[in-house]
UniProtKB/Swiss-Prot annotation:
GO terms for molecular function: adenine binding; adenine phosphoribosyltransferase activity; AMP binding. The keyword Transcription does not apply. This is Adenine phosphoribosyltransferase. Belongs to the purine/pyrimidine phosphoribosyltransferase family. It catalyses: AMP + diphosphate = 5-phospho-alpha-D-ribose 1-diphosphate + adenine. Keywords: Cytoplasm, Glycosyltransferase, Purine salvage, Transferase. Gene3D superfamilies: 3.40.50.2020. It comes from Sulfurovum sp. (strain NBC37-1). Catalyzes a salvage reaction resulting in the formation of AMP, that is energically less costly than de novo synthesis. GO terms for biological process: adenine salvage; AMP salvage; purine ribonucleoside salvage. Signal peptide: none annotated. It is an enzyme of class 2 (transferase). One of its GO terms (cellular component) is cytoplasm.
Length: 186
């Protein structure tokens, strides 16, 4: 399903801009106003549901923390499992981690080693098909690390989906999976 101009406006207008947050010169895109707007949230989720119905997915993986919101709603609508991609040290079972670069240092994300089935395979024995989702892609470091994690445990990241993309940062470059962004922000 292609997002209509009207639907795009409904979603975009529900996202609040917070100037100079978290530091001067940054305009933060606040999705809490999208989440508490039933029409905008439903419009967004209807679009994503229609887009991914034919993908024959096994799981949705949501990036900590806002990816959990959109990912769990979409997983429920598609009748597939949901897997949280967490910051290091937040999961209780055996995990696999992936390091990524920050402006000044490194961070890590992790998933349970059996998050997508034994050796990343679903009940048919084939590699689990996973959609990665988050609210925003800026530089892409966290998302690329999450996509690498999915592949590292033997599953297949079929696409990475973002509600918003800061297009001027060229974040899709070097991504191991196709990338879809609902809204491209310049």
């Amino acid at each position: 399903m292609t997002l209509t101009p009207e639907d795009r406006t409904i979603i975009l207008d529900s996202i609040r801009d917070i100037p100079d947050f978290p530091k001067p010169g940054i305009v933060f895109k606040d999705i809490t106003t999208l989440l508490n707007n039933p029409k905008a949230l439903s419009t967004l989720m209807d679009h994503l549901t229609e887009r991914y119905l034919g993908y024959d997915l096994d799981y949705i993986a949501g990036i900590d923390a806002r990816g959990f919101i959109f990912g769990s709603i979409l997983a429920d609508r598609l009748g597939v499992g949901f897997v949280p991609v967490r910051k290091k040290g937040k999961l209780p079972y055996t995990t696999v981690a992936e390091k990524y670069s920050l402006e000044y240092g490194f961070d890590e994300v992790e998933i349970h080693i059996d998050a997508f089935g034994e050796n990343g395979c679903c009940s048919t024995g084939e590699r689990s098909k996973v959609l990665l989702i988050d609210d925003l892609i800026a530089t892409g470091g966290t998302a690329k690390a999450a996509a690498n994690l999915i592949d590292k445990v033997g599953a297949h990241c079929v696409e990475a989906c973002f509600i918003m993309e800061l297009g001027f940062l060229n974040s899709k470059e070097g991504f191991s999976a196709p990338v879809y962004s609902v809204l491209e922000i310049d």
